[in-house]
C-alpha cells in the first residue's frame, strides 16, 4: 500500500473515536473515507480490514455524526452538490439513521 493510503487510514482510526469532533471535522472524515474508496483496489487485505473497522465505527456512531454534521451542513445538499455515488454510503448516514428509526418505532 502507498504511504498516502496508510496515512489516511491511520488518521481515520485515530480520529473516529473522538466524540468531541466538530461537524466540520466529521465532514472531513467522510471526505477522507471517499478518498480511500477510490484507493481500495490497491489496498492490502490488512488495510481493507482496518477500513471495515472504520466503517463499523461510522455506523455505530451514525446518530451522533448526523447530529454534529447537521449543526454545520445539510448532508442531502452536500451529496447533491458533489454528485456523491450511493456506493459511498457514509455520505448517506442521515438516511440510514432515519430508516433505522422508522424500523424501530
Go through the PLM ranges and name each one.
Residues 25-42:
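Amphipathic, non-membrane alpha-helical rod segments
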Residues 26-30, 48-53:
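Short, charged, amphipathic alpha-helical segments
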Residues 1-30:
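Short terminal alpha-helical segments
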Residues 7, 11, 31, 35, ...:
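Charged, amphipathic alpha-helical oligomerization/scaffolding segments
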Residues 59-105:
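Amphipathic alpha-helical binding modules
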Residues 41-45, 60:
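Structural alpha-beta junctions
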Amino acid at each position: 500500500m502507498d504511504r498516502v493510503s496508510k496515512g489516511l487510514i491511520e488518521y481515520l482510526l485515530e480520529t473516529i473515536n473522538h466524540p468531541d469532533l466538530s461537524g466540520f471535522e466529521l465532514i472531513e472524515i467522510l471526505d477522507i473515507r471517499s478518498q480511500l474508496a477510490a484507493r481500495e483496489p490497491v489496498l492490502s487485505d490488512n488495510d481493507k480490514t482496518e477500513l471495515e473497522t472504520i466503517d463499523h465505527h461510522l455506523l455505530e456512531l451514525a446518530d451522533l455524526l448526523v447530529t454534529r454534521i447537521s449543526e454545520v451542513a445539510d448532508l442531502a445538499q452536500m451529496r447533491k452538490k458533489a454528485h456523491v455515488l450511493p456506493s459511498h454510503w457514509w455520505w448517506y448516514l442521515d438516511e440510514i439513521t432515519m430508516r433505522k428509526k422508522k424500523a424501530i418505532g
